[in-house]
């Protein structure tokens, strides 16, 4: 009796498993490439500032700001914000209308609209008393793995002047984003364009970003050491002004003390720091800042109180 070769039925043969790759994420907006690094650095403070925030409803809130400084006259700002019902993310609500008016009548206004699921529009207006200074219109389309933006700044058909800015970002991998910016300006007797290439690499605990073009270069590095410590390094070079700046920022969070400390040191011999303290259970935040420029022998300090 011959040997019998037992074959498994075709239905029981092992099949090769194909791992389904995750789709590439949207790279976000071009203006937010250096956002993580910039948030590490402290905002310069000078004088005394009082800010009172008031939430009138789930859609509308106002803020009153009084600023007194030795460098100028005291000023008052009224800030209003309206947020609609369409919330795409914790930080994105449509439509959104934001306005800020000072005691002299100057106005800064911004309107954000969601025209379609992937198409967004923004309008920015800035006036100085009764004169228009800036009017800007943006259109942004966010695909699955890319973002395209077109901006028109101060369009004037009569004066034949306009500023056009085009942005494009593409996710190459889950960590690498590449893109560019094209700035075109036109006015009587002058016309030109500037091209800038951009790239961002995101790791688990750090992000490196680079913008380079004929107008200069901008590089930043953000590193999150742990939940309390974040650092940022920034390099900026401007070919038109023949100026180069190197900055180091430090961000320290003390959750048990409800305190946040931000500090910076740059190549212009400037040292600065801002300390924020939340006075719980009161809805009050105190901030104290000081900045010293050794090269120009200038010292600025500020104190602010935020209620609400």
Curated annotation (Swiss-Prot):
InterPro entries listed in its UniProt record: Porin_dom_sf, Porin_Euk/Tom40, Tom40
Localization per Swiss-Prot or TrEMBL: Mitochondrion outer membrane
Question: What broad class describes the main subcellular location of this protein?
Answer: mitochondrion
Annotated GO CC locations: mitochondrial outer membrane; mitochondrion; pore complex
What keywords appear on the UniProt entry? Ion transport, Membrane, Mitochondrion, Mitochondrion outer membrane, Porin, Protein transport, Transmembrane, Transmembrane beta strand, Transport
Could you name the domain of life of the organism this protein comes from?
A: Eukaryota
Q: Outline the segment boundaries, as ranges, of region: Required for mitochondrial targeting.
A: 281-308
Which parts of this chain are annotated as the region Disordered?
A: 1-29
Q: Which Pfam families match?
A: Porin_3
- What membrane topology is given? Multi-pass membrane protein
| GO terms under biological process | monoatomic ion transport; protein import into mitochondrial matrix
Q: List the disulfide bonds.
A: none
Report the GO molecular function annotations. Answer: porin activity; protein transmembrane transporter activity
Question: What family is it from?
Answer: Belongs to the Tom40 family.
Assembly state and interactors? Forms part of the preprotein translocase of the outer mitochondrial membrane (TOM complex) containing TOMM22, TOMM40, TOMM40L and TOMM70. Interacts with mitochondrial targeting sequences.
What is the official name of this protein in its record?
A: Mitochondrial import receptor subunit TOM40B
């Amino acid at each position: 009796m011959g040997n019998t070769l037992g074959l498994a039925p075709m239905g029981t043969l092992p099949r090769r498993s194909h791992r389904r790759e995750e789709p590439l994420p949207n790279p976000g907006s071009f203006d937010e490439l250096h956002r993580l690094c910039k948030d590490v650095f402290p905002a310069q403070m000078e004088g005394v500032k009082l800010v009172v925030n008031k939430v009138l409803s789930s859609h509308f809130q106002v803020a009153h700001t009084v600023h007194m400084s030795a460098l100028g006259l005291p000023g008052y700002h009224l800030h209003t914000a309206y947020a609609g019902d369409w919330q795409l993310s914790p930080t994105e609500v449509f439509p959104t209308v934001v306005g800020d008016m000072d005691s002299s009548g100057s106005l800064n206004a911004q309107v954000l609209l969601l025209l379609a699921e992937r198409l967004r529009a923004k309008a920015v207006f800035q006036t100085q008393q009764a004169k228009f200074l800036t009017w800007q219109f943006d259109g942004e389309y966010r695909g699955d793995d890319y973002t395209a933006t077109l901006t028109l700044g101060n369009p004037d058909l009569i004066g034949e002047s306009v500023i056009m800015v085009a942005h494009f970002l593409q996710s190459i991998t889950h960590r690498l984003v590449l893109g560019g910016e094209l700035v075109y300006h036109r006015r009587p007797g002058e016309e030109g364009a500037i091209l800038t290439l951009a790239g961002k690499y995101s790791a688990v605990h750090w992000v490196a970003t680079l913008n380079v073009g004929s107008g200069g270069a901008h590089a930043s590095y953000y590193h999150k050491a742990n939940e309390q410590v974040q650092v940022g390094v920034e390099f900026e070079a401007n070919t038109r002004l023949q100026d180069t700046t190197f900055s180091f920022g430090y961000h320290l969070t003390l959750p048990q003390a409800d305190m946040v400390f931000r500090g910076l040191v740059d190549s212009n011999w400037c040292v600065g720091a801002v300390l924020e303290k939340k006075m719980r259970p009161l809805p009050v935040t105190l901030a104290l800042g000081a900045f010293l420029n050794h090269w120009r022998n200038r010292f600025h300090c500020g104190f602010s109180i935020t209620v609400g």
